[in-house]
Amino acid sequence: MGKDTLSEIVTSIRNADMAKKETVRITFTNIAQNIVTILLREGFIKNAREHRESKKSFLVLTLRHRRNRKGPSRTLFNLKRVSRPGLRIYSNYQKIPRILGGMGVAILSTSKGIMTDREARLKRIGGEILLYIW
């Protein structure tokens, strides 16, 4: 059975968020870099940087937390893996779902690269739905 790097990324971010961690370290892959770029651009994470440690590269993400008197609380976003190795989910550009009426983001893998649902609708291309973020 192979590794599903995208599920590992989602699980790492979700677990760090529930544990109220400030940073999370994920392995560096091209898919991870593209998804982190989208998360950063959409404002779901605060910062991302690359860290190299003995021939291995990692992405260190700084999560965006709300502050209150008791310390950091959970962020206000959720991640859900949609298409998985056992059941791939594809959609053309007309049927790409709107997450929370446009408040959330769907991340797609298209022939033109990894992009958000809004970008895919504007470019009129469909693809595999990787994640929902709301």
Curated annotation (Swiss-Prot):
Q: Which family does it belong to?
A: Belongs to the universal ribosomal protein uS8 family.
Name the gene that codes for it.
rps8
Q: Per its record, how is this protein called by name?
A: Small ribosomal subunit protein uS8c
Where in or outside the cell it occurs: the entry states:
Plastid, Chloroplast
Q: Which InterPro entries does its entry note?
A: Ribosomal_uS8, Ribosomal_uS8_CS, Ribosomal_uS8_sf
**GO biological process assignments:** translation
Q: Does the keyword Protease apply?
A: no
Fetch the PROSITE patterns from UniProt.
RIBOSOMAL_S8
Top-rank taxon: Eukaryota
* UniProt GO molecular function: rRNA binding; structural constituent of ribosome
Q: Which Pfam families match?
A: Ribosomal_S8
**Entry function:** One of the primary rRNA binding proteins, it binds directly to 16S rRNA central domain where it helps coordinate assembly of the platform of the 30S subunit.
Q: Which SUPFAM superfamilies match?
A: Ribosomal protein S8
Enumerate the UniProt keywords alphabetically.
Answer: Chloroplast, Plastid, Ribonucleoprotein, Ribosomal protein, RNA-binding, rRNA-binding
Query: Mind telling me which GO cellular component terms the entry cites?
Result: chloroplast; ribonucleoprotein complex; ribosome
Q: List the disulfide bonds.
A: none
